[in-house]
């Protein structure tokens, strides 16, 4: 799951060993209880009108017999007294689509916090007896955000769910289900059961105990990875991206923070918060979406882009997996942006890197998107690399005869 992560841009990594899990869980319980109470009071004040609406709706919608109106996907509320025939059909379709991915909250138990982000927290949990990760999105207490802001956040949430719930691949984190917050919904914690207010939603996915790939690379920064492991991780990522592209999905935020490792160290792509279906017209896909350092020149430049922006980001990740280091450590975000677009800045490839792997990096981060390979071809190139003779990055204390790093080219 993606969490705000990097330094220099107002975001940072969350170290789980420095989190007071008990305190955070208590804070979450107090916040949810407070928000639920506020929601209930507001609903009761409008109860008479809503009850009348519900009685009217019971004649037409047997599956929506709720005392309080339930928010539709995308943030709006149904107004059945004034709905046109098309609105009724669309509402029914939304309810049907919801059932495809909506979880049963009574089967979900939320446990300790493992990460925190701008709009919520990631918890360990149990769903129907299975270990899971639960992403709780909290859009703020009543009155703290405008209706338009909340609608936008809900739309982003439903976009992530719409993309994720249809995917099935060993290198993509398995989506289990999600829930939109409603007044009649409740969730369980280790300390009991409480209401889930309408400003809180959750996404439930498989739990990957190996954590983020970024953290794994940081831990192995000094000793580096065996070349065979480098290729295995890179192939996992390449196969996952190739699958996404075959489904017409552009991830748009490919980086090592968004890759998770399971107990067998299989890499799985996570966080589809900014993913979207690829537009048939490339001019429909514009805007700076992603993370600086991994973003392709055309994205940084505000030009139209397509799935090849993921290929560029993969090239940066490939370098990072091989080197177990950060690209552009001495440059600011603004310097990176300018140099990548105007000076063709790329990470310095170590001399000890086998030419077969270096060639993959260079092709993937070519400035011209049309010259970058498809991810299917990248998979084939990586599969063809011989790992039997080694070729991994040489640790710093063994680099006597191998000049592996030079200063980064920069502005």
UniProtKB/Swiss-Prot annotation:
<dbReference type="GO" id="GO:0071244">
    <property type="term" value="P:cellular response to carbon dioxide"/>
</dbReference>
<dbReference type="InterPro" id="IPR008271">
    <property type="entry name" value="Ser/Thr_kinase_AS"/>
</dbReference>
<dbReference type="GO" id="GO:0004674">
    <property type="term" value="F:protein serine/threonine kinase activity"/>
</dbReference>
<feature type="modified residue" description="Phosphoserine; by PHOT1">
    <location>
        <position position="45"/>
    </location>
</feature>
<feature type="modified residue" description="Phosphoserine; by PHOT1">
    <location>
        <position position="43"/>
    </location>
</feature>
<keyword id="KW-0829">Tyrosine-protein kinase</keyword>
<dbReference type="GO" id="GO:0005737">
    <property type="term" value="C:cytoplasm"/>
</dbReference>
<dbReference type="GO" id="GO:0005829">
    <property type="term" value="C:cytosol"/>
</dbReference>
<comment type="subunit">
    <text>Binds to CBC2. Associates with PHOT2, BLUS1 and PM H(+)-ATPase (e.g. AHA1).</text>
</comment>
<dbReference type="InterPro" id="IPR001245">
    <property type="entry name" value="Ser-Thr/Tyr_kinase_cat_dom"/>
</dbReference>
<feature type="active site" description="Proton acceptor">
    <location>
        <position position="253"/>
    </location>
</feature>
<dbReference type="GO" id="GO:1902456">
    <property type="term" value="P:regulation of stomatal opening"/>
</dbReference>
<protein>
    <recommendedName>
        <fullName>Serine/threonine-protein kinase 54</fullName>
        <ecNumber>2.7.11.1</ecNumber>
    </recommendedName>
</protein>
<keyword id="KW-0547">Nucleotide-binding</keyword>
<dbReference type="GO" id="GO:0004712">
    <property type="term" value="F:protein serine/threonine/tyrosine kinase activity"/>
</dbReference>
<dbReference type="GO" id="GO:0010114">
    <property type="term" value="P:response to red light"/>
</dbReference>
<dbReference type="Pfam" id="PF07714">
    <property type="entry name" value="PK_Tyr_Ser-Thr"/>
</dbReference>
<dbReference type="GO" id="GO:0004713">
    <property type="term" value="F:protein tyrosine kinase activity"/>
</dbReference>
<comment type="similarity">
    <text>Belongs to the protein kinase superfamily. Ser/Thr protein kinase family.</text>
</comment>
<feature type="binding site">
    <location>
        <position position="135"/>
    </location>
    <ligand>
        <name>ATP</name>
    </ligand>
</feature>
<dbReference type="InterPro" id="IPR011009">
    <property type="entry name" value="Kinase-like_dom_sf"/>
</dbReference>
<keyword id="KW-0963">Cytoplasm</keyword>
<comment type="function">
    <text>Serine/threonine protein kinase that phosphorylates proteins on serine and threonine residues. Collectively with CBC2, acts as a negative regulator of stomatal opening, probably via the inhibition of plasma membrane-type ATPases (AHA1 and AHA2) activity in guard cells, but in an abscisic acid (ABA)-independent manner. However, at low concentrations of CO(2), together with CBC2, stimulates stomatal opening via the inhibition of S-type anion channels in response to blue light (BL) and red light (RL), thus being a key component to maximize photosynthesis in the light under low CO(2) conditions.</text>
</comment>
<feature type="domain" description="Protein kinase">
    <location>
        <begin position="108"/>
        <end position="385"/>
    </location>
</feature>
<keyword id="KW-0597">Phosphoprotein</keyword>
<keyword id="KW-0067">ATP-binding</keyword>
<keyword id="KW-0418">Kinase</keyword>
<dbReference type="GO" id="GO:0009637">
    <property type="term" value="P:response to blue light"/>
</dbReference>
<dbReference type="GO" id="GO:0001659">
    <property type="term" value="P:temperature homeostasis"/>
</dbReference>
<feature type="binding site">
    <location>
        <begin position="114"/>
        <end position="122"/>
    </location>
    <ligand>
        <name>ATP</name>
    </ligand>
</feature>
<feature type="modified residue" description="Phosphothreonine">
    <location>
        <position position="286"/>
    </location>
</feature>
<dbReference type="InterPro" id="IPR000719">
    <property type="entry name" value="Prot_kinase_dom"/>
</dbReference>
<dbReference type="GO" id="GO:0005524">
    <property type="term" value="F:ATP binding"/>
</dbReference>
<dbReference type="InterPro" id="IPR051681">
    <property type="entry name" value="Ser/Thr_Kinases-Pseudokinases"/>
</dbReference>
<keyword id="KW-0723">Serine/threonine-protein kinase</keyword>
<keyword id="KW-0808">Transferase</keyword>
């Amino acid at each position: 799951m993606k969490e705000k992560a990097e330094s220099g841009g107002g975001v940072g990594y969350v170290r789980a060993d420095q989190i007071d899990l008990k305190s955070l869980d208590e804070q979450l319980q107090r916040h949810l209880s407070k928000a639920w109470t506020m929601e209930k009071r507001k609903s009761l004040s409008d109860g008479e009108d809503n009850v009348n609406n519900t009685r009217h709706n019971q004649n037409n919608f047997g599956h929506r017999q709720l005392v309080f109106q339930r928010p539709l996907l995308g943030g709006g509320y149904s107004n059945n007294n004034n709905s046109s025939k098309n609105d009724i059909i669309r509402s029914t379709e939304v309810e049907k689509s919801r059932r495809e991915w909506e979880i049963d909250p009574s089967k979900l138990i939320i446990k300790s916090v493992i990460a925190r982000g701008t709009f919520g927290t990631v918890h360990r949990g149990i769903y129907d007896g299975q270990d899971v990760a639960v992403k709780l999105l909290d859009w703020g207490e009543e009155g703290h955000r405008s209706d338009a802001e909340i609608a936008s956040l809900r739309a982003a949430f439903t976009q992530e769910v719409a993309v994720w719930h249809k995917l099935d691949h060993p290198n993509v984190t398995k989506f289990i289900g999600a829930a939109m917050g409603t007044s009649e919904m409740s969730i369980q914690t280790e300390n009991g059961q409480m209401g889930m207010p309408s400003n809180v939603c959750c996404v439930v996915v498989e739990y990957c105990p190996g954590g983020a790939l970024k953290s794994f690379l940081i831990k192995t920064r000094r000793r580096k990875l065996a070349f065979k492991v480098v290729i295995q991780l890179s192939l996992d990522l390449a196969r996952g991206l190739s699958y996404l592209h075959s489904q017409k999905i552009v991830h748009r935020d490919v980086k090592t923070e968004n890759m998770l490792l399971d107990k067998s160290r299989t890499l799985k792509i996570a966080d589809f918060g900014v993913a979207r279906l690829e537009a048939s017209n490339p001019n429909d896909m514009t805007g700076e979406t992603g993370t600086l350092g991994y973003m392709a020149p055309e994205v940084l430049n505000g030009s139209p882009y397509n799935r090849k922006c993921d290929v560029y980001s993969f090239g940066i990740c490939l370098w990072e997996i091989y080197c177990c280091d950060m690209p552009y450590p001495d440059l600011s975000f603004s310097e990176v942006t300018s140099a990548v677009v105007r000076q063709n800045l790329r990470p310095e490839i170590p001399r000890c890197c086998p030419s077969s792997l270096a060639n993959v990096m260079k092709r993937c981060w070519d400035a011209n998107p049309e010259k970058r390979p498809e991810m299917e071809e990248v998979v084939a190139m990586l599969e063809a690399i011989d790992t039997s003779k080694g070729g991994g990055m040489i640790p710093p204390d063994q680099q006597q005869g191998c000049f592996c790093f030079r200063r980064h080219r920069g502005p």
